[in-house]
From Swiss-Prot:
Topology of this chain in the membrane: Single-pass membrane protein
Full protein name: Cytochrome P450 94C1
Listed InterPro entries: Cyt_P450 (IPR001128), Cyt_P450_E_grp-I (IPR002401), Cyt_P450_sf (IPR036396)
Alphabetical list of PANTHER family matching this protein: CYTOCHROME P450 (PTHR24296)
Transmembrane segments: 2-22
Keyword Transferase in annotation: no
Organism: Arabidopsis thaliana
Gene3D superfamilies: Cytochrome P450
Record localization: Membrane; Endoplasmic reticulum membrane
Disruption phenotype: No visible phenotype under normal growth conditions, but mutant plants accumulate high amounts of 12COOH-JA-Ile in response to wounding.
Disulfide bond residue pairs: none
UniProt-listed Enzyme Commission number(s): 1.14.14.49
Amino acid sequence: MLLIISFTIVSFFFIIIFSLFHLLFLQKLRYCNCEICHAYLTSSWKKDFINLSDWYTHLLRRSPTSTIKVHVLNSVITANPSNVEHILKTNFHNYPKGKQFSVILGDLLGRGIFNSDGDTWRFQRKLASLELGSVSVRVFAHEIVKTEIETRLLPILTSFSDNPGSVLDLQDVFRRFSFDTISKLSFGFDPDCLRLPFPISEFAVAFDTASLLSAKRALAPFPLLWKTKRLLRIGSEKKLQESINVINRLAGDLIKQRRLTGLMGKNDLISRFMAVVAEDDDEYLRDIVVSFLLAGRDTVAAGLTGFFWLLTRHPEVENRIREELDRVMGTGFDSVTARCDEMREMDYLHASLYESMRLFPPVQFDSKFALNDDVLSDGTFVNSGTRVTYHAYAMGRMDRIWGPDYEEFKPERWLDNEGKFRPENPVKYPVFQAGARVCIGKEMAIMEMKSIAVAIIRRFETRVASPETTETLRFAPGLTATVNGGLPVMIQERS
């Protein structure tokens, strides 16, 4: 016993010494004292910018090529559409997610679609495309959203409206709503998060913690630190593993339960994936479905939070949306949810959602890793193993891309002369990625966002309650754009 303890202590000190050696010597090989690296390491950028993404936007605007290098992160960051096309389309095979990315998110996402490459990625993408594109799944998803709106969302909003002065965190509502709906779609499981008095879901909390701590891994300038903490099971890495254990336990229970009850007549994704995934590979099944759960929950909520924040600052846009809803659905509140055919006629609402995601994309940036040495379209040299990031948040704020009115919330930029929605080239607007990795859940996400927007805008007036939130949005670290402090609003039902 004494020998084991002694060995553990020696191992611990060896790791500490090795970590310090790594920090003090090896990191110097890629560290320089340039303005960008110094500002990143010392966080001096915080003196002038609220969000890291705003600082990156400033740097990318200042760069003649809209591309910068952050040497301490071994990273190239770009807001140049020609580079985005090169990364996502022209030279796609040289920019996989990469082993480095898989290590960062592997504990949470395993071999899921958002953390895989090659045959594993192709298999899941083909499978997911078939399922999400099927009429039965789309009808099932719309019915889930419709039921959640009618039985949970609207009663809660009415309850707060009946209590003047009460404050509701809309971001929390959207996260609860989307977690309920994506859980039902993915697992056939209802966590029942969107009900008063807003219960704490063990599953949802575990997801929040795991995604936050995984994102912090990706931002770490010295990866060996979090790897050492993971090895020793201490600090944030211990907390991350505990959260992932909760996810694994609950997901495992749901998979076992579904295998016992059978798949016949089930439209949820786990039932459909079970039909093609080997019976002895529940871990792979868990990875597939958890990836969809993570993407479907956080991105929709993030997109809606930015959208409603912008509406409170632009009542003229909200009024035009209401005019369109009255034209398509009729006046009055007889219809609280929109049919799919009605939503297809809502071009101005569609344009407003796209415009809000231009300014506040749910995923602010996305990274790949270069397999081989390469040269980007703007002439930037990329070494093998370099992390290459295209920054959707910055791209939405570039006058070179959107013109001198880039700061304006202007849905009209998405409409043609007849008022019909006109999409932009995805390499200019990579909110849903582009090329082979374009988001396969885009249509379903837009359906959910439109459904919620219609239900709220027709029935209620919202006003931001916090002076700080009124002026700007401060984002918390995470895989998606979560607003620090939420979106506190006061609700009033329209007459």
